[in-house]
Regions:
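Class I SAM-dependent methyltransferase Rossmann-like catalytic core
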Residues: 52-70
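Conserved alpha-helix/loop element of class I SAM-dependent methyltransferases that forms part
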Residues: 65-84
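Conserved class I S-adenosyl-L-methionine
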Residues: 85-94
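Short beta-strand element of Class I
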Residues: 109-112
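Conserved SAM-binding loop
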Residues: 124
Length: 126
């Protein structure tokens, strides 16, 4: 978790078993499905990003393999340019289709994923 900063104050976050905390005490809980929501609590309530139906539709479409050639090429390019044991961030990862592909192709790398949609992160965390 030392790759991320607190979204409230900008201090480094420390990962704990049940979430993350910064030195100023701002804490972020880990969801049952394994992701940590780093959005500040003062945002308007509601579903940010893609909703459950949108995420499921994209997941189902991608699982049919239509974008597999693109994902495979992305993995080859990352392998060519990323150092061994690299830390790779997938910002705006959606439901994790490319994240999972890169993680499977480069098992020695640390893959981090971010998305504003809680529904997408629930699938990515699996």
């Amino acid at each position: 978790m030392n790759y991320f900063l607190c979204s409230v104050c900008g201090e480094k976050l420390t990962e704990l078993e049940k979430g993350a905390v910064c030195p100023k005490g701002h804490s972020f809980d880990k969801a049952k499905s394994g992701y940590i929501n780093l959005l500040p609590n003062n945002l308007p309530k509601g579903n940010h990003g893609d909703n459950k139906l949108m995420v499921k539709a994209r997941h189902d479409f991608l699982e049919n393999g239509y974008y597999a050639p693109l994902r495979n090429e992305l993995c080859r390019v990352i392998k060519k340019y990323a150092p061994e044991n690299a830390v790779i961030l997938d910002a705006g990862c959606g439901e994790g289709y490319y994240t999972k592909g890169v993680a499977d192709f480069l098992p020695d790398c640390r893959i981090l994923a971010l998305d504003i949609s809680k529904d997408a992160m629930k699938i990515t965390a699996k």
